[in-house]
UniProtKB/Swiss-Prot annotation:
Cellular-component GO terms for this entry: cytosol
Keywords: ATP-binding, Cytoplasm, Kinase, Nucleotide-binding, Thiamine biosynthesis, Transferase
Protein name: Putative hydroxymethylpyrimidine/phosphomethylpyrimidine kinase 2
Compartments it resides in: Cytoplasm
Source organism, top-level taxon: Eukaryota
Associated pathway: Cofactor biosynthesis; thiamine diphosphate biosynthesis; 4-amino-2-methyl-5-diphosphomethylpyrimidine from 5-amino-1-(5-phospho-D-ribosyl)imidazole: step 2/3; Cofactor biosynthesis; thiamine diphosphate biosynthesis; 4-amino-2-methyl-5-diphosphomethylpyrimidine from 5-amino-1-(5-phospho-D-ribosyl)imidazole: step 3/3
Single GO MF descriptor: hydroxymethylpyrimidine kinase activity
Organism field: Schizosaccharomyces pombe (strain 972 / ATCC 24843)
Function, as annotated: Catalyzes the phosphorylation of hydroxymethylpyrimidine phosphate (HMP-P) to HMP-PP, and of HMP to HMP-P.
Family stated for the protein in its record: In the N-terminal section; belongs to the ThiD family. In the C-terminal section; belongs to the thiaminase-2 family.
BP GO annotations: thiamine biosynthetic process; thiamine diphosphate biosynthetic process
EC number(s) recorded for this UniProt protein: 2.7.1.49, 2.7.4.7
């Protein structure tokens, strides 16, 4: 990337850890300094549709830092399981220890636990690290029908892990297996009422909460098992020992879908990591899976569908705190930006060869422009709705007024009186530019106002910083005072403040809105160039006074 003095001056100004206000995946504003964290302890799925691959995709797409401890390596795809290579219990514990030792985590989910010894290892770790939100997905049968566990595993799961569990998430076949292992009969599940009875039985095994998933049994509007082509629903039941909560969603006639159980449990864990209540986490998790099924990508050869874990991802091509770098190097922005910050008007100004009438004309128009620049900040204050933001807009107005006083003083030193400034007629370029700013601010939001003013605010510092490094600059030249005014700590502080506002705003915007604002930035940049070009053409080009060094 070519040298830009702005990057150097703003380095370390936008440490993401300092941004305390963030949006969670549901759009809730949350105050926090760090990413939420969750750990998945499960088997792998080389095809990416289930297991830890699905877990980590889900956590990432929901804004959670995901860690994993692999229990088994599974050669499978949506069509079935080919083979399983089990990890040693000691190695599973070692993975968990490595994760938690470095990144503390209390929201943990489990998936496929390949042996009784691995279940015991996970239970030991749960006690050792006090997993307060342990979500257990009792993976027993693959979507394809392949068995993934033995009877011994079920016994140890019931006896050692479920009593430590915050939420267990069996589907109906898994719930039947869990209950049968303890000598409890919950077969013949044909209605929502039967599901409630089943959930209550599973609750007796020790977990604090049971989420019985109803995806294997669509029901009609009476809550009865049905396969008719009618308005079928899927009902998931959450039981806390006292109350049943029903979560109803439309039944998607997609056939078999690979990885829904893994994805739901990891989604619930993710929302718990965001500190949502359990009922919220369950509802949000169901909604996430519903969307992932709805947008199932038709890319696999197996008849079983796969999930689209990325339905909620919105890709932006910049990291938090680095948007200014991104926009100034954006291929659509660069041509207009380069023309603006490298204009021959500024080069001749720094060299001292710019005709005085050209500079005087610029000073007059800039005075009129500052009036409208202050009006724009006032408009921003009107559009804000919090005291800190209103105050910040007011401070920007004050800064422009202070800049105006310096401007009047500078004008006087170049033979332009205050009366000259007040009686000056606004040029078409100044009128077009300033009214574009005000019109954009009136018609759009605060973000648009920040972007339409940004080329002026940022550009003047960038130009001054560039000119200070140019070999052709005349430090004793007649216009060095102008360069000094915009290459000073006071002005840089204003630039930093404006850039920080933009950096914080863009984190809340969609990619589409960001692109719209970039286009506003480009147009405002072109108006800035026109602001140089008007006096340059009138007093340099038309008079054949161009400096050959810049031709």
């Amino acid at each position: 990337m070519p040298y830009n003095p702005l990057y150097e001056s703003l380095s370390n100004q936008f440490d993401p850890s300092r941004i305390e206000t963030v949006l969670d995946p549901m759009g809730y504003t949350i105050k926090r300094r760090a990413l939420p964290v969750s750990l998945t302890i499960a088997g792998s799925d080389c095809s990416g549709g289930a297991g830890i691959q699905a877990d980590l995709k889900t956590m990432t797409s929901l804004g959670v830092y995901g860690m994993s401890a692999i229990t088994c390596l599974v050669a499978e795809n949506a069509g079935g399981v080919d083979s399983v290579e089990e990890m040693s219990p000691a190695f599973v514990e070692s993975q968990i220890d490595c994760c938690i030792r470095d990144i503390p985590c209390h929201v943990v989910k489990t998936g496929m636990l390949g042996s009784p010894e691995i279940v015991k290892a996970v239970a030991r770790s749960a006690k050792k690290f006090n997993f307060s939100k342990l979500v257990v997905d009792p993976v027993m049968v693959a979507t394809s029908g392949d068995s993934l566990v033995t009877k011994d595993i079920v016994s140890v799961l019931n006896e050692e892990l479920l009593p430590l569990t915050y939420l267990v998430t069996p589907n109906i076949p898994e719930a039947i297996v869990l209950a049968k292992n303890q000598g409890l009969d919950i077969s013949n599940i044909n209605s929502v009422s039967d599901m409630e009875r089943c959930a209550a039985v599973i609750h007796k095994l020790g977990p604090k909460h049971v989420l019985l998933k109803g995806g294997h049994m669509p029901v009609n509007n009476l809550g009865l098992k049905s396969s008719d082509d009618e308005d079928l629903r899927v009902v998931d039941i959450l039981y806390d020992g006292n109350r049943f909560y029903h979560f109803s969603s439309s039944y998607l006639k997609k056939g078999e879908v690979h990885g829904t159980g893994c994805t739901l449990s990891s989604a619930i864990a993710s929302f718990l990591a965001w500190e949502h209540s359990l009922t919220e986490a369950v509802q949000f998790g169901i909604d996430y899976v519903h969307g992932a099924i709805t947008h199932s990508p038709p890319i696999n050869n197996c008849s079983t569908n796969i999930l689209n874990h990325m339905t909620r991802l919105r890709i932006v091509p910049f990291a938090p705190g680095h948007f200014i770098e991104y926009i100034l190097s954006h291929p659509q922005v660069v041509p207009a930006w380069k023309e603006y910050i490298n204009h021959k008007f500024t080069n001749m100004l720094a060299k001292g060869t710019l005709p005085l009438p050209a500079f005087q004309d610029y000073l007059k128009q800039d005075y009129l422009y500052l009036v409208n620049f202050a009006r724009a900040y006032s408009l921003k204050g009107y559009k804000e709705n919090t005291f800190p933001n209103i105050l910040e807009a007011a401070q920007s107005v004050i800064h422009v007024i202070e800049e105006k006083e310096l401007h009047v003083s500078m004008c006087s030193s170049y033979g332009v009186s205050l009366q000259d400034l007040k009686s000056c007629e606004e040029s078409p370029a100044c009128t077009a530019y300033s009214r574009y700013i005000l019109d954009t601010g009136a018609a759009q939001d605060v973000a648009a106002l920040d972007f339409v003013q940004a080329p002026c605010l940022i550009g003047y510092y960038v130009i001054a910083a560039r000119l200070m490094k140019e070999p052709f600059r005349n430090p004793q030249g007649p216009y060095q005072k102008w360069v000094d005014n915009y290459f000073c700590e006071d002005y840089l502080s204003a630039v930093r403040r404006g850039c920080r506002q933009i950096e914080e705003i863009v984190l809340k915007l969609s990619p589409e809105r960001i692109q719209e604002l970039i286009e506003i930035f480009i147009r405002a940049t072109k108006f800035e160039t026109l602001f140089w070009e008007t006096p340059y053409y009138e007093y340099v080009t038309k008079q054949n006074l161009e400096d050959k060094e810049f031709s």
